[in-house]
């Protein structure tokens, strides 16, 4: 499995949405638990994402609403990101593995249907 995390996502107030560096271990623990079958997550357009209750929140006041904010998949933002990836891929020309272009195209189609 491949896991993707955006530690630098900003909230509406222009501050980092995720609490900080030391709390990254909470997500890394979830990744290990997922690989080892101790958690199942929930399906999303991008794959499997953690459920709020699967993260160890001990010692941190991080609400379900805040978690929903950091795991939200905004269609327009993602379509913009994928457009940028397409431009970058086009610069690679024939050197780009076809599978990467196919994955990008598949994600774009999924977001367009959402």
Predicted features along the sequence, with ranges:
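Flexible, glycine-rich loop/tail regions that form catalytic "lids" or insertion modules at the edges
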Residues: 1-114
């Amino acid at each position: 499995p491949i896991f993707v995390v955006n530690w630098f996502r900003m909230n509406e107030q222009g501050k980092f949405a995720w609490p900080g560096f030391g709390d990254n271990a909470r997500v890394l623990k979830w990744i290990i638990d997922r690989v080892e079958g101790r958690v199942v997550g929930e399906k999303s357009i991008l794959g499997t994402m953690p459920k709020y209750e699967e993260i160890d929140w001990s010692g941190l006041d991080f609400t379900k609403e805040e978690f929903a904010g950091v795991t939200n998949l905004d269609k327009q933002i993602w379509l913009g990101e994928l457009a940028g990836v397409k431009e970058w891929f086009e610069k690679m020309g024939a050197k780009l593995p076809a599978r990467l272009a196919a994955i990008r195209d598949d994600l774009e189609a999924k977001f367009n249907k959402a």
